[in-house]
Amino acid sequence: MKTIKRATLLLLFAIIYDACPTIACTGISLHAADGSYIQARTIEWAASPLPSEYVIIPRGKKLRSYTPTGRNGITFTSRYGVVGLSVVESDFIAEGINEVGLSAGLFFFPRYGSYEPYDEAHNAITLADLQVVEWLLTQFATIEELKAAVESLRIVGLDSSAVVHWRIGEPSGHEVVMEIVGGDIHFYDNHIGVLTNAPGFEWQMANLENYVNLRAGSAQPLQLGEVTLQPLGGSSAMLGLPGDFTPPSRFVRAAFFRNTAPKRATGEATIEQAFHLLNNFDVPIAVENP
């Protein structure tokens, strides 16, 4: 029975990782005037139906990580209650929040990230990348606590073909991106409030400088010799904003939409605003599967 279950899990892992090119994750964070902090995201899965479920983890639950050779990784007991949405397995929380307000989500990060090589001798401190959200939300109240603890672990992938990176936020609005490159863990303050997929966060931020000409609103009329040119419609000062579904283009589009959006009065109104903004990142299935 254990052999059958492990084979089934390996097949599910293969489905997740093989579909990486068809996954488009776009995350934004928003602040309301009443102090509420909202994290919102999409998971555009254009390959096949994605098994997912609502997960509740109470305090005091004993948990164990998977490794590439089975469920024999690090063991831990939840210190905080957690709610979240999982993919494939209930332990693989894609987005969640704990009882003290720390929130986290994973975003696929193919080709650019790389973990430490898996070594079965270190199973006692080995944590699967797809269980990092489960681990950190059940263990920590702050980002600083996470930073102090994560260096003692070996985070590995259950399949070598893809990796993920993570967005972590506190109720105050302090938000970081965590990436692992060459086995080294990097944290970046996320002041822009956006995350997509590859390339890495530093590259995405540098790429934003290609769009310093963009503005909210309409462009001013231009006198060209004896001809006066007028904008053809509203939001013409955003002409040049990328509209495709690649991660760099979604990052730029989300950054401008998020940072030009008016601040709403309440958290509830900001949740509605987040849905409206993220509608701009729906990926039609036929785009990936013609």
Regions picked out by a protein language model, each given a short descriptive name:
Residues M1-T8:
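Bacterial N-terminal signal peptides that target proteins for export
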Residues T8-D18:
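Bacterial N-terminal signal peptides
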Residues H31-D34, N98-V100, E170-G173, E179-D184, ...:
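Short acidic-glycine loop/turn motifs at beta-strand connectors
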Residues S152-I185:
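Catalytic cofactor-binding cores of redox enzymes
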